[in-house]
Amino acid sequence: MKKRLIWLLPVLVGFLVFVLFQTVFLLGYVPSESMEPTLREGSMILGTRIYRELNNGDIVVFEHNGELFVKRIAAGPGEEINVEGKTYHVPPNAYFVLGDNSENSFDSRYWENPYVSEDKIIAKIVIPS
């Protein structure tokens, strides 16, 4: 009986960790310098896939045109934001995102559709390293 438990416990723990990272948490890294100095390129981040709400200032991981991005929410649904002399009106269920390193960030300012749909947000960052 003890021999069975010796190998069963690590398998169960490994399975539980796998399930948690597929459903609740996101462990990743920052792919570029667009979020510096807040998040350094290559630094590890921990996000949660389960959150109550998103607010301006939150850092999120999202999918845009088949790529994953890490950016900060600058404006939320129904808000208006003026960036570099241009006014944006954020539609319902969408967000306007910017990188902290504005000179080195490919973000909402440059996209044909500058808004990130709520359903494209994968996680809210809770622990940057």
Located regions from the model:
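Extended hydrophobic leader/signal-anchor segments used for secretion and membrane insertion
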Residues: M1-S129
